[in-house]
Protein backbone atom coordinates (compact mmCIF):
# COMPACT_ATOMS: atom_id res chain seq x y z
CA UNK A 1 0.00 0.00 0.00
CA UNK A 2 2.82 2.39 0.89
CA UNK A 3 4.60 1.67 -2.38
CA UNK A 4 1.48 2.49 -4.42
CA UNK A 5 1.15 5.85 -2.65
CA UNK A 6 4.88 6.50 -3.20
CA UNK A 7 4.60 5.65 -6.92
CA UNK A 8 1.51 7.87 -7.26
CA UNK A 9 3.24 10.82 -5.57
CA UNK A 10 6.39 10.26 -7.64
CA UNK A 11 4.25 10.19 -10.81
CA UNK A 12 2.51 13.43 -9.85
CA UNK A 13 5.86 15.09 -9.11
CA UNK A 14 7.23 13.93 -12.47
CA UNK A 15 4.11 15.20 -14.23
CA UNK A 16 4.47 18.60 -12.51
CA UNK A 17 8.10 18.87 -13.65
CA UNK A 18 7.22 17.97 -17.24
CA UNK A 19 4.32 20.45 -17.31
CA UNK A 20 6.40 23.30 -15.90
CA UNK A 21 9.15 22.60 -18.44
CA UNK A 22 6.57 22.58 -21.20
CA UNK A 23 5.12 25.85 -19.91
CA UNK A 24 8.59 27.42 -19.88
CA UNK A 25 9.19 26.31 -23.45
CA UNK A 26 5.78 27.70 -24.42
CA UNK A 27 6.61 31.06 -22.83
CA UNK A 28 9.96 31.18 -24.66
CA UNK A 29 8.23 30.38 -27.95
CA UNK A 30 5.67 33.11 -27.28
CA UNK A 31 8.48 35.60 -26.55
CA UNK A 32 10.19 34.70 -29.83
CA UNK A 33 6.96 35.17 -31.78
CA UNK A 34 6.35 38.57 -30.17
CA UNK A 35 9.94 39.63 -30.89
CA UNK A 36 9.54 38.56 -34.52
CA UNK A 37 6.32 40.55 -34.81
CA UNK A 38 7.96 43.65 -33.33
CA UNK A 39 10.95 43.35 -35.66
CA UNK A 40 8.63 42.87 -38.66
CA UNK A 41 6.60 45.90 -37.59
CA UNK A 42 9.77 47.99 -37.25
CA UNK A 43 11.00 46.85 -40.66
CA UNK A 44 7.61 47.65 -42.18
CA UNK A 45 7.67 51.15 -40.74
CA UNK A 46 11.17 51.72 -42.08
CA UNK A 47 10.13 50.42 -45.49
CA UNK A 48 7.25 52.91 -45.58
CA UNK A 49 9.59 55.85 -45.04
CA UNK A 50 10.04 57.12 -48.55
CA UNK A 51 11.78 59.97 -50.23
CA UNK A 52 8.47 61.49 -51.32
CA UNK A 53 5.97 63.34 -49.13
CA UNK A 54 2.47 62.01 -48.54
CA UNK A 55 -0.81 63.93 -48.63
CA UNK A 56 -0.51 67.12 -46.55
CA UNK A 57 3.16 66.38 -45.96
CA UNK A 58 5.50 69.36 -45.92
CA UNK A 59 7.34 70.04 -49.19
CA UNK A 60 9.21 72.82 -50.98
CA UNK A 61 8.55 71.78 -54.60
CA UNK A 62 6.37 69.38 -56.65
CA UNK A 63 9.18 66.85 -56.90
CA UNK A 64 9.08 66.29 -53.13
CA UNK A 65 5.49 64.98 -53.27
CA UNK A 66 4.51 61.38 -54.03
CA UNK A 67 2.79 60.28 -57.23
CA UNK A 68 -0.55 62.05 -57.92
CA UNK A 69 0.32 64.83 -55.47
CA UNK A 70 1.59 68.34 -56.07
CA UNK A 71 2.72 71.25 -53.92
CA UNK A 72 -0.08 73.57 -52.83
CA UNK A 73 0.32 77.03 -54.40
CA UNK A 74 0.00 78.96 -51.11
CA UNK A 75 1.15 76.46 -48.51
CA UNK A 76 4.14 74.15 -48.36
CA UNK A 77 2.31 70.81 -48.31
CA UNK A 78 1.35 68.14 -50.82
CA UNK A 79 -2.20 67.97 -52.17
CA UNK A 80 -3.93 65.77 -54.76
CA UNK A 81 -3.19 66.83 -58.33
CA UNK A 82 -6.52 65.57 -59.70
CA UNK A 83 -5.20 62.56 -61.63
CA UNK A 84 -6.18 58.90 -61.37
CA UNK A 85 -4.39 55.66 -62.21
CA UNK A 86 -4.93 51.94 -61.89
Curated annotation (Swiss-Prot):
It is found in: Secreted. Residues 22-50 form a propeptide. One of its GO terms (molecular function) is ion channel inhibitor activity. Residues 1-21 form the signal peptide. Keywords: Disulfide bond, Ion channel impairing toxin, Knottin, Secreted, Signal, Toxin. Expressed by the venom gland. It comes from the Eukaryota. InterPro entries: Huwentoxin-1 (IPR011696). The keyword RNA-binding does not apply. Ion channel inhibitor. This is Omega-theraphotoxin-Hhn1e.
Amino acid sequence: MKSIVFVALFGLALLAVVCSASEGAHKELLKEVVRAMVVDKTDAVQAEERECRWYLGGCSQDGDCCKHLQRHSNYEWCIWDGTFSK
